């Protein structure tokens, strides 16, 4: 019975996925994922990216966000990206494959950033979802806390942070923590984010001293 339910659920997901207008547009444009549109909407409202910036992309694969940011920061900009999964190369993106939760991977990522600070840290990280919020939300919150730690280490004063967060236990505390570190904080739900998803994007600008 469980197998039948899972099969029906998977079929619904596939049907929804392929009928999604953003998935269709991504395929037509040759984009790596529909996530490209989410970041485009955020950029239109918040103007995070400018030519020549250095950006850290966490949870980068398959590369939708990096693919978008390259068009905004130009040839003199730089992206340092990391994901547990492999990612096909993108010109202008320095990709590190590894588990961001691993201290050695974090160290390697910091070495790639080097001594100079970055202007934007962005995280689209999410754990493998079990479908049980009591399990999934704490896992997701752990990842976004790590992303915020990365901000503390590498983000320049006045820099920006954009992070995918799933609403649930710990969300309000996390939002308060970000507000203590940045001068302006917005919670965005892009049109290209599925309505039934718990995901929202926190956009924080103006890192405080």
Curated annotation (Swiss-Prot):
Q: Its catalytic activity?
A: uridine(2552) in 23S rRNA + S-adenosyl-L-methionine = 2'-O-methyluridine(2552) in 23S rRNA + S-adenosyl-L-homocysteine + H(+)
Q: In the UniProt entry, which residues are flagged as the active site? A: 164
Which positions in this protein are listed as binding S-adenosyl-L-methionine?
63, 65, 83, 99, 124
EC class of the enzyme, as a word: transferase
Q: Does Methyltransferase count among this protein's keywords?
A: yes
Give one Pfam hit by family name. Answer: FtsJ
Q: Which UniProt keywords apply?
A: Cytoplasm, Methyltransferase, rRNA processing, S-adenosyl-L-methionine, Transferase
Q: Which Gene3D superfamilies match?
A: Vaccinia Virus protein VP39
Q: Where does it reside?
A: Cytoplasm
The UniProt GO MF terms for this protein read: rRNA (uridine-2'-O-)-methyltransferase activity
Classification via InterPro entries:
RNA_methyltr_RlmE (IPR050082), RNA_MeTrfase_FtsJ_dom (IPR002877), rRNA-MeTfrase_E (IPR015507), rRNA_MeTrfase_gammaproteobac (IPR004512), SAM-dependent_MTases_sf (IPR029063)
Q: Name one GO cellular component term.
A: cytoplasm
User: Any idea of its EC number?
Assistant: 2.1.1.166
Q: Where is the signal peptide?
A: none
Keyword S-adenosyl-L-methionine carried by entry: yes
- Mind telling me which NCBIfam families this protein's record contains? PRK11188.1, rrmJ
Q: Which family does it belong to?
A: Belongs to the class I-like SAM-binding methyltransferase superfamily. RNA methyltransferase RlmE family.
Function per UniProt = Specifically methylates the uridine in position 2552 of 23S rRNA at the 2'-O position of the ribose in the fully assembled 50S ribosomal subunit.
Q: What is this protein called?
A: Ribosomal RNA large subunit methyltransferase E
- Which gene is transcribed and translated to give this protein? rlmE
